[in-house]
A protein has these predicted regions:
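Short acidic-glycine-tyrosine-enriched beta hairpin
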Residues: 256-268, 379-402
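Active-site region of the double-stranded beta-helix
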Residues: 1-263, 278-375, 414
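Residue-level marker of beta-strand positions
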Residues: 19-21, 266, 272-274, 282, ...
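Short beta-strand His + acidic residue motifs that chelate non-heme Fe in jelly-roll/DSBH
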Residues: 274-279, 284-287, 360-362, 380-381, ...
Length: 419
């Protein structure tokens, strides 16, 4: 274990400058099998401070160099992130194509992609650095970070509508950052969010509503699969078949509720509530770092699984969302507004607004924090972050956040796990 080796070495260390290498194996459960990769942790102590790097590459020592010079040589030669456990770590983005548009990942670790910490041209996978950083300042080794991503649907109706799905354990929160005016000329977009109260009331019981809705979904799924099969065979569906698909889809969707949203709105998605972001609505999303879901319906061919989960989902789904809590305003210095906009059992999110030139000392935290800029420019530890750029703030960091003089105001989101 690299951290245990580092702890024993550091306790016994009597030199002002020293270098420790630890070869270890890291499990990679995100690949779906209990595979392991061989890595080397590099710890460099100089003047009572430590720098950390990790690599899967062979390291060749130059005996003419001092420990610190050797460390910096390896970092440069192999393009490794040089991590100070007390300093913020920039998050790289990774774009994933979806049937409905694209996702932009910041902290995901899964088979489809592993996100990185970055510094200049250097990049290190998040779980690698978590495994070697002392004090769990970037989260516990082996534990995923709160999931941060952008959802960017196509502006085209139907094509850009996401899966109507629910989660049994995962909670999600969206902050709307843009409404495509091509899709929504008045600047008001939508998310499919639960079910129509009038439709529910028109049924003799909630159970009767569930069955009626399931019948509509089943009829649509049958027609959807027919069209998908014809397309896969290189055949063109007839106009009558396409018209039937549209009629069945509109009937199925008539049972659901459409919630209007505009820029800056916050949408909290509790467990078991079916939801589907609609075309042309761009959001920043924080969510529980798990990947389970049940697909209730989708107006395209589902590529990630060979079935819908409608039958099972309809039994347990919430029909209507719980009451929306109001944002909690937290004490803050002049020129700064802090709102707690999400308070889930597993994570919370604050929205912070700072006037031009304002400075804020947030203080240390018991956990890491994820920060993503909404608008304006933020200077943090000497690095400037613009809109949709993100950084992990380690738990013990106590530096200053500065709003740029160049923009009228700064707004960013700050998330932390509740643990």
């Amino acid at each position: 274990e690299p951290l245990a080796c580092y702890g024993r070495w550091r306790d016994a260390l009597q030199l002002d400058e020293a270098l420790l290498l630890v070869d270890f194996s890291l499990s990679t459960p995100w690949l779906g099998q209990m595979q392991q990769i061989s890595l080397t942790a590099i710890y460099c102590v100089c003047d009572n401070s430590v720098r950390v790097a990790v690599t899967d590459q062979l390291l060749v020592a130059d005996t003419s160099l001092s420990p610190q010079a050797q460390y910096l040589d390896w970092v440069s030669a192999h393009q490794l992130v040089d991590a100070d456990p007390q300093a913020p770590l920039r998050l790289a983005t990774q774009t994933i194509d979806k049937p409905w548009g694209q996702e932009i990942w910041y902290t995901a670790v899964e088979r489809r992609g592993v996100c990185n910490f970055v510094a200049g041209k250097a990049a290190t996978p998040i779980p690698w650095l978590q495994a070697v950083l002392p004090g769990a300042v970037a989260g516990e080794p082996g534990q995923p970070l709160v999931l941060l991503k952008i959802l960017d649907p196509s502006p085209q109706p139907v094509l850009g509508d996401l899966y109507f799905e629910l989660h049994e354990a995962k909670r999600e929160a969206y902050v709307v950052t843009g409404i495509n005016r091509q899709a929504w000329p008045d600047g008001i977009g939508y998310i499919r969010y639960g079910f129509d109260p009038l439709k529910i009331a028109s049924c003799p019981s909630p159970e009767a509503f569930r069955q009626e809705y399931l019948n509509a979904v089943t009829a649509y799924e049958r027609q959807r699969r027919l069209l998908d099969t014809l397309t896969a065979e290189g055949k063109t569906p007839s106009s009558a078949q396409v018209a039937t698909e549209r009629q069945l889809r509109e009937h199925m969707d008539s049972y659901t509720a459409m919630r209007p949203v505009q820029k800056s709105d916050v949408v909290r998605v509790p467990v078991l509530l079916p939801h589907a972001l609609q075309h042309g609505v761009r959001v920043i999303e924080f969510q529980t770092p798990s990947y389970e879901r049940k697909i209730v319906s989708f107006a395209q061919k589902v590529l990630t699984q060979d079935h819908w989960d409608s039958q099972e989902a309809v039994v347990s789904m919430l029909l209507e969302p719980p009451a929306e809590p109001a944002p909690v305003h937290r004490p803050s210095p002049e020129g700064i507004t802090i709102e707690q906009i999400v308070d889930f059992p597993d994570f919370e999110v604050e929205r912070v607004t700072m006037v031009r030139g304002a400075r804020w000392l947030p203080g240390a935290s018991s956990t890491y924090r994820l920060l993503i800029v909404l608008e304006g420019e933020l200077t943090l530890a000497g690095v400037v972050y613009a809109a949709e750029q993100a950084v992990l703030v380690p738990s013990q960091w106590q530096g200053e956040l500065l709003a740029s003089q160049a923009a009228p105001s700064l707004a960013f989101l700050l998330a932390r796990p509740n643990c």
